[in-house]
Amino acid sequence: MDSVTPTLPRNILSIQSWVSYGHVGNAAAIFPLQRLGFEVWGVHTVQFSNHTGYGAWTGPVFEPGVIAELLDGIEARGVLPQCDGVLSGYVGSGGTVAAVVGAVGRVRQAHPQALYCCDPVMGDVGRGVFVHPDLPALIAAQAIPAADIVTPNQFELELLTGQKVETLADALAAAHALRERLNPAGPRIVLLTSLVRADAPASSIETLAVTGEGSWLCRTPLLPLDPPRNGTGDAIAALFYGQFLRTGSAEQALTLSMSALYALLDLTHRLGTREIQLVAAQGEFERPRHLFAAERVE
């Protein structure tokens, strides 16, 4: 009987918020990535009781120095060369942006092929900017040029580029403009999430992946989730990033991640819960039962 040689999982450093109750930030990203087969080294930028969508919460925002201190400890274990990528989301304060970019630099120094995926959490349609007013400019100036993959929602793409997105042509133009500002040594992928445009079929929502090899659009039915569920953007950033690291294909990653996200949100809707049902939907993350195929648009 042939023996199978065991292999170690790949490793991702994820720097985001954390909540004790519910699923946003690292609490929405770590588990899906683990289900995709990754070891995740979680570094938390805040430790809140629950997400801020409830209007009240408790807990601290961590000082930027905490991130560097935790990286010191990880580096002391001699494992940074084994880190395959960095994922960042909600950062909490301006100094934390520089700390995240510093962490990316340290990982790349140890492992030059490591990919940085930046979810530029700043705001959303209907809510406007919900972070400190200084953060959008700092993210644009520091995190975006370091990123290999960036996953803005429609509001954040407009904020980062100054371009209004109302049609598919608008979305492609803005995504290409942002893509030109990403790390020139990387794949330069823009994943535009929660795209709602005037020239799309009714009752649908789309995600657009723009790369140097082409652009793909994935459309799913728009579920009547009111209010919109917090953590959705954190989950899709993690799912897309993980699937891209697994497949090396933006098209495949878009199909698989959006199909998994739809299954997650559909189950959340059917159960009628305020929090996204990550644990209940976990079987959909690696191999979604129903695929929404990405369509090439350029």
Swiss-Prot record:
Gene Ontology CC terms, in alphabetical order: cytosol
Enzyme class: transferase
EC number: 2.7.1.35
Family: Belongs to the pyridoxine kinase family. PdxY subfamily.
Assembly: Homodimer.
Alphabetical UniProt keywords: ATP-binding, Kinase, Magnesium, Nucleotide-binding, Transferase
Cofactors, names only: Mg(2+)
GO molecular function annotation: ATP binding; magnesium ion binding; pyridoxal kinase activity
Catalytic activity of the protein: pyridoxal + ATP = pyridoxal 5'-phosphate + ADP + H(+)
Function: Pyridoxal kinase involved in the salvage pathway of pyridoxal 5'-phosphate (PLP). Catalyzes the phosphorylation of pyridoxal to PLP.
Residues annotated as binding substrate: 17, 234
One of the GO biological process terms: pyridoxal 5'-phosphate salvage
HAMAP family (alphabetical): PdxY
Residues at which ATP binds: 119, 156
Protein name: Pyridoxal kinase PdxY
Domain of life (superkingdom): Bacteria
Pfam families given in the database record: Phos_pyr_kin
